[in-house]
Amino acid sequence: KKHFEKYLGGAGAICRHLSSFVNKTNLLSYLGQNNDELKFIKSNLGKKIIFDFISKKDSPTIIKERFVEEINNRKIFGAYSLNDSSVSSLEEKKLEKKLSKFLKKSNLVIVSDYGHGLISKNFAKKIISKKKFVAVNVQINSSNIGYHSLQNYRNANCIIINENELRYEMRSKTEKIENLLKLLSKNLNLQFLIVTRGYSGAILYDAKVKKFYYSDAFANKVVDKVGAGDAMLSILAICLYKKIDCDLSLLISSLCASQSVNSIGNKKAISKTTLLKELEHYLAWWNEYL
């Protein structure tokens, strides 16, 4: 029996998560040279999301297919349609022009860099240089491992990665994770560095005050982990930008991640109503416990 579902991923999914929490979101990315999938993308972005794209020559719009075993939703294999070569210098200039236009009316920049050729080292530096609050997710995946690095994002305000990505970046299998967070924060001149650890929760390190914050994993049931990091980054970036207490910021974003893993892929955006109910329930329990 075959069943097919299709969702927005990556930056599109992040924008959908943000929609319930901000007045307006700008989305900048690239499509294939024939603008394939544009109709689908438009139909799945809400009215609060203003989008602009460049067309990448000799490339399709990125599609990632996962073939999943029906009973327990276990991934059997994946097939990617993409051209991960770098955008041309002309295409990058178009990106820079569009970015400058968006940034005039923006307070917060969220960069989701999946290593598929959109963001060069030079372009990453220009994003950081705009003096906005910049939060970054640099994902290591099967198509970019060995080539993708956090080093392009020196001086960003916030970076979120998972533990495997942290250990890969630092070339360390056994070092205490807190030591790695301190060292990487220093190397990249970051204030906030967050590492997610699956069932072990998440750790936030604030280099400014040299303090660690910890959160448990709140998901009772994990249907699919895809997109959990993006969901967490979306809301955590807002919280840290608004200078919400780090403990509370990490708690809120961890609850968002737990929402994300309860559905397949990026099928559902973070629900603000559900989040507030869960937060109220947790804080009530915590006050009673104390």
Residue ranges of each PLM-predicted region?
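Substrate-binding N-lobe of the ribokinase-like
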Residues: 1-62, 93, 277-280
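A generic structural signal for short hydrophobic patches within well-formed alpha-helices
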Residues: 166-167, 275
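Residue-level signal for inorganic ion chemistry
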Residues: 18, 109, 159-162
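Conserved phosphate-binding/catalytic loop of the ribokinase/pfkB sugar-kinase fold
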Residues: 53-59, 64-103
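A structural signal for isolated positions on well-ordered beta-strands in alpha/beta enzyme cores
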Residues: 26-30, 52, 108-110, 135, ...
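Short, surface-exposed connector motifs at secondary-structure boundaries
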Residues: 19-26, 104-108, 188
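Conserved phosphate-binding/catalytic region of the ribokinase-like
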Residues: 86, 105, 112, 119-155, ...
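Non-cysteine beta-strand/loop elements that form the S-adenosyl-L-methionine
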Residues: 68, 155-164
